[in-house]
Amino acid sequence: ALDYVINIHNPKRIAFRDKTLAILEADMNINTDVKLKYSHKKKSVSNSYKRFKGEIKGLNKLNAIAAKQDLEKKFTEAALNSSPHSEKYGDIIFKLEKLYKEKEKYSMARAYFLEFMYYSGPDMMNFAVGFRPIVGQLSSHSENTVEVDKAVARLKLKSKNYFKNLHLPTEKKLFAQLLQVYYENVDKSLHGKAFDLLEGKYKMDYKKFTNYIYSKTSFVNQEKCTNILNNMNESTAIALKKDVGYQVMNSIATAYYEMVKPRQAEYANDIEQLSKYYVEGLQILLPNEKKYY
């Protein structure tokens, strides 16, 4: 787990945010309007960016990976040399390493999904994803109108800041370049249908694909979005499903919720169970050793 954090998870998320910050800084340096609009986003992206870097620095300073590996080696040797405990504890480290390796592609897909959709990606995706539960409720003929009304109210409030700070040239750069990062780093088996049009008609031309999406979607048109939110019903939900911006967002989100999140949860549960045995075994076999869980 430490090796994953230091050498894979944090560096990948840092690289993603590097891309976001580079785009924002370049546009902010030449346009005071962009500087005003995106100062909060830049600060938000920078905060976790620094935290990810700090975690790597701190763990490396502690030589945490080597210490953890040394403890695991001692544990396995002690287990294998103790006949009452060899069967229960002897292969725990091997099993844990195998699970972490298998879980890796799902963990990284989750990380890229969160970065692209919520934390440091294009604002249009972050805005559009708020419509997903509303469309789901209305499409299923749900009678839970209270929840729909609450979600619509939240989006109306959010839309004010969203459109106030939206600068399309910057937004389109974020979408094109970060979509490419997502595509190239998330395992293709977990892409879902999000990239069919990009791979087919647009032949992996991210700029042309982006121009198409932003020229057709209602999510960058304040008047259209206001009208949608003021008239949210089943017919509106059906129409939103045909919006190209919604389709990109929804296909990425559907791939995550159907293919990534369940598998990651399964691996997390298996790892938790084995980790309990590992901690139990440490107390029995190496009671005086400093622990690195």
Predicted feature locations:
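Terminal presequence/propeptide segments associated with secretion/organelle targeting
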Residues: 1-292
